[in-house]
């Protein structure tokens, strides 16, 4: 009997889910078991991530499911997992700020991330077949209008403005540090990036040359402005978008991907020193590993949401969360005593908001997220299947082009960020299909 890839994925996810749940229950009953349990679930986290990435590898390692796992691991899990063998001695490395660091809640936080992660993959597996059939029914959106492709020039102009203004902020950042970002308006010019990105998207839609590598490169170059003002996560997300389309065309080897990863972490380390205003890394290993561990800062928001849940609920109600602009990230920071009023806050994260909203709303959110992930992954599989027909795969490439940066960054963003992005893309695709149908009818009439 041959076991399919999906069955392996289900077995792996179910085992990971049950191991974490069982160990969590034992630890609640007997807190003395926590230190050993912490090591066990840390090892299981690494194994689970590696196995899922290997199981989902079809055309290459770079695919939506891989990016989902990478997002959780590097934005959430890497720090608690890295220090798992000596957690008691390294508590201040895992939770760097706050009123009182509780080792037991650090363990609980890790388990509370692992369990929804396994549940997400299970939900993804359940929906994958249906979603794949749905994706196969998407309309062909390939059309162009040469005159509208001139908007590419406007995109280039906005990119230049954004990079110039970001460089000026970069000079200021070297003098004041990121913890004074709001006071000096370091993030006031980010809208120029949004303008340039939308111009590139419109140009991609209506120009004859639908080169996704070219447009990914243009957006990535523009996103360098983010890293200049200390927001390196966005630059990394758009860098991975470029790598994805390069991998689709050239099938990048793992050694080149590792080389790019080392290069990115080294550059991030140098920018981090400049951003904070002090030397935080020493030696080659410090330059490579410390930026990775610093990316795991979103684990602190998970810890805060779990340990100080009642304080956060008193700070921001569900009504405020859904219907006002009140920031849950600030409430998490305030609850654990690390609020930076002029910038540099820990903000929020996918899993901290999952904890805040509770398991009923959270389960619905995970169901929707798994559906969205299956939708984007199915588009990737259609691209691989139709790799020799660029026109046939255009719609699927377009969807991934629009959705992938949000997926790469999802673990650090809000709970509904990726879900709403996929919803808007679906509405956009529907509207674009209508526009194309009308345009073709007009062309036939003439």
Swiss-Prot record:
Annotated keywords: Cell inner membrane, Cell membrane, Lipopolysaccharide biosynthesis, Membrane, Transferase, Transmembrane, Transmembrane helix
UniProt function note: Polymerase involved in the biosynthesis of the lipopolysaccharide (LPS). Catalyzes the polymerization of the O-antigen repeat units on the periplasmic face of the inner membrane, leading to the formation of the lipid-linked O-antigen molecule. In vitro, shows a preference for bacteria-based, undecaprenyl-containing substrates rather than eukaryote-based, dolichol-containing substrates.
E.C. code: 2.4.99.27
Pathway(s) where this gene product acts: Bacterial outer membrane biogenesis; LPS O-antigen biosynthesis
Encoding gene per record: wzy
Native source species: Escherichia coli
Record's keyword annotation contains Phosphoprotein: no
Reactions this protein catalyses: n lipid-linked O-antigen repeat units = a lipid-linked O antigen + (n-1) polyisoprenyl diphosphate
Residues in coiled coil: none
Membrane association type: Multi-pass membrane protein
Cellular compartments annotated: Cell inner membrane
A GO BP entry: lipopolysaccharide biosynthetic process
Residues annotated as transmembrane: 11-31, 33-53, 58-78, 104-124, 147-167, 186-206, 211-231, 252-272, 355-375, 391-411, 415-435
Protein name as it appears in the record: O-antigen polymerase
Keyword Cell membrane carried by entry: yes
GO MF term (any one): transferase activity
GO CC term, one of those recorded: plasma membrane
């Amino acid at each position: 009997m041959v076991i399919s890839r999906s069955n392996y994925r289900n077995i792996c996810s179910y085992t990971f889910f049950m191991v974490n749940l069982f160990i969590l229950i034992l630890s609640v009953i007997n807190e003395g078991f926590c230190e050993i349990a912490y090591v066990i679930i840390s090892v299981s986290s690494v194994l689970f991530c590696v196995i899922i990435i290997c199981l989902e590898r079809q055309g290459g390692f770079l695919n939506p499911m891989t990016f989902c796992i990478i997002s959780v691991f590097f934005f959430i899990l890497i720090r608690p997992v890295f220090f798992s063998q000596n957690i008691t001695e390294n508590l201040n490395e895992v939770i760097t700020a706050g009123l009182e660091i509780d080792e037991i809640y650090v363990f609980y936080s890790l388990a509370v991330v692992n369990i929804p992660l396994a549940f997400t993959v299970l939900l993804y597996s359940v929906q994958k077949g249906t979603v794949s059939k749905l994706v196969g029914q998407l309309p062909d959106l390939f059309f162009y209008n040469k005159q509208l492709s001139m908007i590419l020039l406007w995109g280039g102009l906005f990119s230049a403005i954004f990079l110039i203004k970001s460089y000026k902020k970069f000079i200021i950042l070297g003098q004041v540090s990121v913890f004074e970002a709001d006071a000096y308006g370091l993030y006031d010019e980010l809208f120029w990036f949004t303008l340039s990105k939308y111009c590139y998207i419109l140009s991609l839609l209506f120009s004859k040359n639908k080169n996704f590598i070219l447009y990914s490169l243009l957006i990535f170059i523009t996103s360098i402005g983010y890293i200049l003002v200390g927001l390196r996560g966005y630059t990394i997300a758009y860098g991975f978008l470029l790598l994805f389309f390069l991998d689709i065309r050239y099938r990048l080897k793992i050694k080149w991907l590792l080389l790019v990863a080392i290069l990115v972490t080294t550059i991030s380390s140098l920018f981090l020193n400049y951003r904070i205003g002090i030397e935080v890394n020493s030696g080659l290993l410090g330059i490579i590993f410390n930026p990775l561990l610093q990316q795991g800062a979103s684990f602190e928001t998970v810890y805060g949401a779990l340990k100080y849940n009642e304080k956060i609920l008193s700070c921001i109600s569900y009504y405020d969360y859904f219907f006002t602009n009140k920031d849950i990230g600030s409430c998490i920071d305030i609850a654990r005593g690390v609020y930076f009023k002029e910038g540099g806050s820990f903000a929020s994260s996918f899993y901290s908001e999952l904890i805040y909203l509770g398991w009923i709303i959270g389960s619905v959110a995970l169901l929707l997220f798994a559906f969205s992930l299956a939708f984007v992954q199915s588009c990737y599989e259609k691209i691989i299947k139709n790799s020799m027909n660029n026109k046939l795969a255009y719609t699927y490439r377009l969807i991934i082009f629009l959705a992938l940066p949000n997926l790469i960054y999802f673990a650090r963003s809000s709970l509904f960020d990726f879900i709403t992005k996929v919803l808007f893309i679906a509405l956009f695709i529907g509207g674009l299909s209508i526009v194309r149908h009308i345009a073709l009818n007009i062309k036939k009439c003439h």
